[in-house]
Amino acid sequence: MSIFEYNGSAVVAMVGKNCFAIASDRRLGVQLQTIATDFQRISKIHDRVFIGLSGLATDVQTLYQRLVFRHKLYQLREERDMKPETFASLVSAILYEKRFGPYLCQPVIAGLGDDDKPFICTMDSIGAKELAKDFVVSGTASESLYGACEAMYKPDMEAEELFETISQALLSSVDRDCLSGWGGHVYIVTPTEIKERILKGRMD
């Protein structure tokens, strides 16, 4: 078993019309034993940028704390929030810096850039970025997430339809992966509001 599969995870981000959604499962396990059913994988960096971290839970929390620290330093120095592209480059640089003893995480970054244009990307544990215009996935359920997202995604969805699509994709995918699941956590972000919703799925 890969160390990336030790705790289990599923994270997905999807682009809509001037909005994006990012979702994750809520299970924290140690291989097949469930430890917690309300684990937070998605974090808000500021109102227009979110990050979801799949992988080893200890490294997820350590990396998140470092990212918050670096973003606050940037805010103090520049007196503004980071753009999503800048934040993605920061995450990539932090991961690459530790490439010989890497953080065992695979981040998914989603944000709204200039002119409310949505930006999503994912990267591997040493910071190699993968940009996309439709959706990105990571975690132990990524194979089934790819299939579900390919089947359900369509461009320029409004916020409510995007929520429905990402939720169905997440819930149907975690049912096919025994290391992730126990409901879902979804954020839908538009230029004017942030909606947070908890999904109830199969509780086994």
UniProtKB/Swiss-Prot annotation:
Subcellular location per the Swiss-Prot or TrEMBL entry: Cytoplasm; Nucleus
Domain of life, source organism: Eukaryota
Alphabetical keyword list: Cytoplasm, Nucleus, Proteasome
Gene3D superfamilies attached to this UniProt entry: Glutamine Phosphoribosylpyrophosphate, subunit 1, domain 1
Cited InterPro entries: Ntn_hydrolases_N, Proteasome_beta_3, Proteasome_bsu_CS, Proteasome_sua/b, Proteasome_suB-type
BP terms from Gene Ontology: proteasome-mediated ubiquitin-dependent protein catabolic process
Cellular component GO terms held in the UniProt record: nucleus; plant-type vacuole; proteasome complex; proteasome core complex, beta-subunit complex; secretory vesicle
Entry's family note: Belongs to the peptidase T1B family.
Function: Non-catalytic component of the proteasome, a multicatalytic proteinase complex which is characterized by its ability to cleave peptides with Arg, Phe, Tyr, Leu, and Glu adjacent to the leaving group at neutral or slightly basic pH. The proteasome has an ATP-dependent proteolytic activity.
Quaternary context: Component of the 20S core complex of the 26S proteasome. The 26S proteasome is composed of a core protease (CP), known as the 20S proteasome, capped at one or both ends by the 19S regulatory particle (RP/PA700). The 20S proteasome core is composed of 28 subunits that are arranged in four stacked rings, resulting in a barrel-shaped structure. The two end rings are each formed by seven alpha subunits, and the two central rings are each formed by seven beta subunits. The catalytic chamber with the active sites is on the inside of the barrel.
Protein name listed in UniProt: Proteasome subunit beta type-3-A
Gene: PBC1
